[in-house]
């Protein structure tokens, strides 16, 4: 008997860092003949439709983002909301899409619904005869930590006090954010545990080679199947070329000499920290290209420059707020070092690149991803922070020099370790095996 062709609904959190990985997985499902209905806000459709590689198998359905007090007018995505404290209102808006979401599900009758932040999806799935799969596109380590802290800090029969909730753990991110509101009448912690405890199965965008022990821990704690998709990165575009201005600029410098620094499209540095970081790049005396949003309170990058900076680096340094072709830049032979925030998607791109890695994590799972790369896999270095998490120009320069100087033992060691892991992870058979196994798990779930 042939395996069932599935109809899968995708409903990710309204952030491109979630929506894009969901779409990459949709493309993999569609390649093998499965049907996908991908539900998203209208403005996101404009950005994502070109990433749909199988339009005959993947259908986009837009959903209206309700107006919520405190949410900026027209906001449909975290990118529309620079102030991270207002993201709770977007979560409220997501929850208020439930009636329209239910109408869509009732109409199309899917076999499986994959979701993340919309913790109530399992209730909808049960109502209409579908299976629910919580898909985590952040590191399994960070999800495991939230479970560990709550279950192990205090006796199970004793409620946590506010002081216990605020307690910090050495070398781990401050977890008080888990207990703050994330939506109307719900905390981030309750949303996260609800997402994972109510579903029929958990899927993680990772692989056993990197996070096997964390995935096994999640399976044990939630007493359910945890299936892995692998990192699900897009295939490199055949013949993809770098836009002319960047290609021409990079080609001016010798092989492996350029620093490429990127912090993602959803994070905004404080002005003084932005200035310190670009001064640190300048201090290395190496050419550099930095892609970053304008700092908080600034309309443009240029208005935040320290005095004299633009003139001093005009021949070897560029800072831009434009979207850049990150993967294509990472493949350019002039680039030798990737300075990044270690968001989960960026982490995989960094691991699969041939560049030296320097990490400056900013928040959430980025801190744990960095610990994994720097301390466990030993494929890069983390920039040392000062009081209050401050990244000084001296410490940034020191970290970069430690991996870029030809005679540096640290640089040699992380390069050797990185090459080993890149060889393992770049195996096409390895990644296709994960997708094949994931699809079989979905088919078994609906039988």
From Swiss-Prot:
Lineage top rank: taxon: Eukaryota
Tissue: Mainly expressed in flowers, flower buds and young leaves, and, to a lesser extent, in old leaves, stems and roots.
Database matches in InterPro entries: UDP-glycosyltransf_plant, UDP_glucos_trans
Pathway: Secondary metabolite biosynthesis; terpenoid biosynthesis
Keywords: Transferase
GO biological process, one term: saponin biosynthetic process
Keyword Secreted attached: no
Xref: SUPFAM superfamilies: UDP-Glycosyltransferase/glycogen phosphorylase (SSF53756)
Biotechnology comment: Soapwort saponins possess anticancer properties and are also being explored as enhancers for endosomal escape in targeted tumor therapies. They may also serve as precursors for vaccine adjuvants.
Active site as annotated: 18 (proton acceptor), 116 (charge relay)
Entry's Gene Ontology molecular function annotations: UDP-glucosyltransferase activity; UDP-glycosyltransferase activity
Record has Nucleus as a keyword: no
Record-listed UDP binding positions: 265, 323-324, 341, 346, 349
Protein EC: 2.4.1.-
Family, as annotated: Belongs to the UDP-glycosyltransferase family.
Function description: Component of the oleanane-type triterpene saponins (e.g. saponarioside A and saponarioside B) biosynthetic pathway, leading to the production of natural products with detergent properties used as traditional sources of soap.
Protein name: UDP-glucosyl transferase 79T1
Natural source organism: Saponaria officinalis (Common soapwort)
Name of the gene this protein is made from: UGT79T1
């Amino acid at each position: 008997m042939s395996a069932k062709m599935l109809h899968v609904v995708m409903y990710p959190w309204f952030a491109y860092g979630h929506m894009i990985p969901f779409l990459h997985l949709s493309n993999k499902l569609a390649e093998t003949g499965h049907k996908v209905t991908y539900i998203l806000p209208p403005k996101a459709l404009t950005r994502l439709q070109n990433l749909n590689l199988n339009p005959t198998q993947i259908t986009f359905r837009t959903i209206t983002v309700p107006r919520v007090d405190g949410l900026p007018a027209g906001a449909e995505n975290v990118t529309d909301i620079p102030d991270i404290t207002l993201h709770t209102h977007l979560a409220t808006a997501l929850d208020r899409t439930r009636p329209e979401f239910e109408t869509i599900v009732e109409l199309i009758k899917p076999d499986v619904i994959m979701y993340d932040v919309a913790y109530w999806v399992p209730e909808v799935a049960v109502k209409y005869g579908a299976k629910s799969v919580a898909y985590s596109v952040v590191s399994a380590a960070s999800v495991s930590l939230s479970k560990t802290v709550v279950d192990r800090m205090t006796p199970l029969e004793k409620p946590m006090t506010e002081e216990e909730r605020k307690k910090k753990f050495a070398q781990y991110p401050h977890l008080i954010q888990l207990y703050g509101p994330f939506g109307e009448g719900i905390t981030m912690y309750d949303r996260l545990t609800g997402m994972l405890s109510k579903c029929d199965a958990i899927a993680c965008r990772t692989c056993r080679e990197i996070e096997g022990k964390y995935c096994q821990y999640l399976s044990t704690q939630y007493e359910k199947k945890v299936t892995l998709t692998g990192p699900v990165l897009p295939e490199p575009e055949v013949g993809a070329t770098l836009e002319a201005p960047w290609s021409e600029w990079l080609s001016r410098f010798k092989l492996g000499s350029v620093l490429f620094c990127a912090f993602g499209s959803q994070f905004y540095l404080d002005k003084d920290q932005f200035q310190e970081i670009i001064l640190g790049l300048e201090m290395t005396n190496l050419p550099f290209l930095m892609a970053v949003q304008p700092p908080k309170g600034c309309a443009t990058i240029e208005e935040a420059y320290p005095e004299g900076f633009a003139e001093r680096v005009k021949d070897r340094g560029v800072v831009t707020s434009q979207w850049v072709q990150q993967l294509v830049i990472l493949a350019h032979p002039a680039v030798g070092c990737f300075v990044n925030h270690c968001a989960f998607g960026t982490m995989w791109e960094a691991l699969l690149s041939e560049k030296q890695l320097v990490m400056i994590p900013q928040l959430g799972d980025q801190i744990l991803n960095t610990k994994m790369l720097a301390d466990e896999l030993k494929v890069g270095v983390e920039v040392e922070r000062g009081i209050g998490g401050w990244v000084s120009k001296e410490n940034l320069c020191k970290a970069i020099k430690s991996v870029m100087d030809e005679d540096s033992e640290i640089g040699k060691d992380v390069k050797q370790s990185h090459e080993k892991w890149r060889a393992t992870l770049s195996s096409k058979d390895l990644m296709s095996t994960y997708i094949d196994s994931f699809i079989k798990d979905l088919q078994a779930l609906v039988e």
